[in-house]
């Protein structure tokens, strides 16, 4: 009789299944808190693996980028075309405190603005706020008919486009460098900078639909917990101060 394993008997062991462990049992939910400049403070929740050994859950959460519609943040459907990026900077208990990280337009909004018979004017400029944030702001605008114009098209000449772009540079730089990041974000919602550009461009070529379509943070100052807590106020509050859309007509400037 041959000595060895009986292959027929050993075959049954291969069919044994491993015990399935639900990966969600090792994770925790954290609340994401938006700064107090937005009406809705509770943005949502995020998952992270529990702290284990040398791996800390807080380290995994810091630096996460969350993209939220401004319509959800301010409970205003008219602002649904703006996307706000928030960055997790600090963890307090089960709350992730965020700060503004960028702003962009939805692609459908941008496509709806571009039309025939008009000239598109774009500009981008790097600015530094009073609290040390270096941002790149992208502006967009379109030519429109003059009040007494009969002609169908509203094409601007190359020299006029150059002058309009120069005016955009000056106004964006002036408005952004004279305030901190919080005040600059509050200028995006009522489109105060866009209206300033529209007023200043009347003498060159009238513009319409002027927006700061994108804002990108290139460099941030050294992280300060006290400033972040000041921005959030009481992090347990579920509502903040809504940014109003009321626009006050600025004084007419003789020279820019």
UniProtKB/Swiss-Prot annotation:
It holds the Pfam family Ribosomal_S3Ae. Disulfide bonds: none annotated. GO terms for molecular function: structural constituent of ribosome. It is found in: Cytoplasm. GO terms for cellular component: cytosolic small ribosomal subunit. GO terms for biological process: translation. The modification N-acetylalanine is found at residue 2. Keywords: Acetylation, Cytoplasm, Ribonucleoprotein, Ribosomal protein. It comes from the Eukaryota. Belongs to the eukaryotic ribosomal protein eS1 family. Component of the small ribosomal subunit. Mature ribosomes consist of a small (40S) and a large (60S) subunit. The 40S subunit contains about 33 different proteins and 1 molecule of RNA (18S). The 60S subunit contains about 49 different proteins and 3 molecules of RNA (25S, 5.8S and 5S). This is Small ribosomal subunit protein eS1. It comes from Coprinopsis cinerea (strain Okayama-7 / 130 / ATCC MYA-4618 / FGSC 9003). The lineage of its organism: Eukaryota, Fungi, Dikarya, Basidiomycota, Agaricomycotina.
């Amino acid at each position: 009789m041959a000595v060895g394993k009986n292959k027929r008997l050993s075959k049954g062991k291969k069919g044994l299944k491993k015990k399935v462990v639900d990966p969600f049992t090792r994770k925790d939910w954290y609340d994401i808190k938006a700064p107090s400049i937005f009406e809705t403070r509770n943005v949502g929740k995020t998952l992270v693996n529990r702290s284990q050994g040398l791996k800390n859950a807080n380290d995994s959460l810091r630096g996460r980028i969350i993209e939220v519609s401004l319509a959800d943040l301010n409970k205003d459907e008219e602002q649904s075309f703006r996307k706000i990026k928030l960055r997790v900077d600090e963890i307090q208990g089960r709350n992730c405190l965020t700060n503004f990280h960028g702003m962009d337009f939805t692609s459908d909004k941008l496509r709806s603005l571009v039309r025939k018979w008009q000239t598109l004017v774009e500009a981008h400029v790097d600015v530094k706020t009073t609290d040390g944030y270096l941002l790149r702001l992208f502006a967009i605008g379109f030519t429109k008919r003059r009040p007494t114009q009969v002609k169908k098209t509203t094409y601007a000449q190359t020299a006029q486009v150059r002058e309009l772009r120069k005016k955009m540079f000056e106004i964006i730089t002036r408005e952004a460098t004279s305030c901190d990041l919080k005040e600059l974000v509050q200028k995006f919602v009522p489109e105060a900078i866009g209206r300033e550009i529209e007023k200043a461009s009347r003498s060159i070529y009238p513009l319409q639909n002027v927006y700061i379509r994108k804002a990108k943070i290139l460099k941030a100052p050294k992280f300060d917990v006290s400033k972040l807590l000041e921005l959030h106020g009481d992090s347990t509050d579920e509502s903040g101060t809504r940014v109003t859309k009321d626009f006050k007509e600025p004084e007419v400037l003789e020279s820019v």
